[in-house]
C-alpha cells in the first residue's frame, strides 16, 4: 500500500488498485472509472476540457491517492493536471473470467496515445491466451506518456511518436515485460537477455497478428537484427551468457535484444509451437517469483520438453 499526495486538479496514476476513488475524484468521474473495470468499451474517464475546467478531482488543496498492489518488485506512478485519461478492461483469464483494467494517460496532442487503450486491450488478451499464454497476473496496466520507453510492474512509460506501428510495437514490448522480468523475478541488470530477449520475442509474435507476418518480419530484421549482423566489431560479439554488466554499447544491445530473441525463436522452431509452449509454461510455473538464472532456464526448458536440449 502506498499514497501519492498531490495538489487539486492533479490526477495520480499508479500501479495497483485505487483504494479511495470517491475521496479524490468528483461524483461525475468516479463512476466512469468504476464502470470501466467491467466494460469492454473504451471510455474517457477525463477529457482535456474536464481537466482544464477543474471537473475531475475533488477540490481540496491536496488530495491523497491511495493504491494497493500485490506481488510487485517496484513502485512507480505518474501525475498530471492536463493529461487525458482513457480506460477499458478485458478478460485475461477465460477460465475464471477475471478481468484486468487497461488505462492510458497522455497529452491530447499525442495521436498515437489515443489508440493506446485499444492496443493495450489487444495485447493483454494476446499475452494471456497466445504467447506466452499465461493469464496477465495483475489487476491493471497503465500506459503513461513520458520521455522514455521503460517498463514497470503494471505501468509503462512511453514516449510519443508519429509512427503508429512503431508506437504499438513499443507498447507491446513494454507490456510483455510483465512476464519477464516481473512475473519471474529475473535480475535484469545481470541477465538482460532473460527479460529483453523474451519481450523482443513476444513483440515480434504479437506483431505478426497486428500487421501481418511479412511486415513483422521486416520490422524485426531491421530494428532488432540488422545492427547485430552488420556490426564489424568482433569485440562486441560476446557470448549471450556474458553477464550484462560486463558488456556495453552495441554489444549490450545485441546480446540483450536481437541475439537473445533469435535463440528463443530457434528453440521454438526446433521443438514446434506445442512442445515449446509446454516447456515454456513449465519454466514459468516452476520459477515464477523465484529469480531464475540462465541455468535454471536451461534445465527447466529441458525438463518441460522432456529432452536434453544441451
Where are each of the predicted segments found?
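Hydrophobic helix-coil surface modules that form long, contiguous segments used
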Residues: 1-172, 201
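Active-site-adjacent structural elements in folded domains
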Residues: 141-142, 162-166, 242-252, 265, ...
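Acidic/His/Gly-enriched intrinsically disordered linker/tail segments
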Residues: 196-262, 270-271
Amino acid at each position: 500500500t502506498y499514497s501519492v499526495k498531490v495538489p487539486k486538479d492533479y490526477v495520480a496514476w499508479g500501479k495497483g488498485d485505487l483504494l479511495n476513488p470517491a475521496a479524490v475524484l468528483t461524483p461525475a468521474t468516479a463512476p466512469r472509472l468504476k464502470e470501466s473495470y467491467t466494460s469492454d468499451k473504451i471510455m474517457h474517464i477525463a477529457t482535456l476540457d474536464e481537466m482544464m475546467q477543474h471537473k475531475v478531482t475533488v477540490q481540496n488543496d491536496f488530495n491523497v491517492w491511495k493504491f494497493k498492489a500485490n506481488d510487485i518488485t517496484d513502485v512507480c506512478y505518474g501525475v498530471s493536471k492536463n493529461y487525458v485519461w482513457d480506460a477499458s478492461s478485458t478478460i485475461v483469464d477465460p477460465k475464471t473470467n477475471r478481468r484486468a483494467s487497461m488505462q492510458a494517460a497522455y497529452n491530447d496532442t499525442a495521436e498515437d496515445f489515443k489508440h493506446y487503450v485499444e492496443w493495450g486491450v489487444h495485447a493483454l488478451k494476446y499475452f494471456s491466451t497466445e504467447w506466452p499464454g499465461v493469464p496477465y497476473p495483475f489487476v491493471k496496466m497503465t500506459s503513461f506518456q513520458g520521455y522514455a520507453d521503460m517498463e514497470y510492474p503494471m505501468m509503462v512509460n512511453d514516449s510519443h511518436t508519429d509512427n503508429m506501428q512503431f508506437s504499438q510495437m513499443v507498447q507491446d514490448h513494454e507490456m510483455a515485460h510483465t512476464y519477464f522480468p516481473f512475473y519471474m523475478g529475473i535480475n535484469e541488470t545481470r541477465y538482460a537477455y532473460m527479460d529483453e530477449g523474451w519481450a523482443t520475442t513476444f513483440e515480434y509474435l504479437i506483431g505478426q497478428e497486428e500487421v501481418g507476418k511479412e511486415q513483422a518480419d521486416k520490422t524485426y530484421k531491421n530494428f532488432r537484427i540488422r545492427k547485430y549482423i552488420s556490426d564489424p566489431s568482433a569485440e562486441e560479439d560476446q557470448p549471450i551468457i556474458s553477464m550484462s554488466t560486463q558488456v556495453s554499447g552495441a554489444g549490450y544491445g545485441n546480446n540483450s535484444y536481437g541475439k537473445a530473441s533469435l535463440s528463443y525463436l530457434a528453440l521454438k522452431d526446433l521443438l514446434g509451437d506445442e512442445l515449446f509452449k509446454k516447456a515454456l509454461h513449465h519454466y514459468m510455473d516452476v520459477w515464477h517469483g523465484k529469480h531464475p538464472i540462465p541455468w535454471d532456464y536451461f534445465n527447466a526448458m529441458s525438463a518441460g520438453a522432456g529432452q536434453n536440449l544441451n
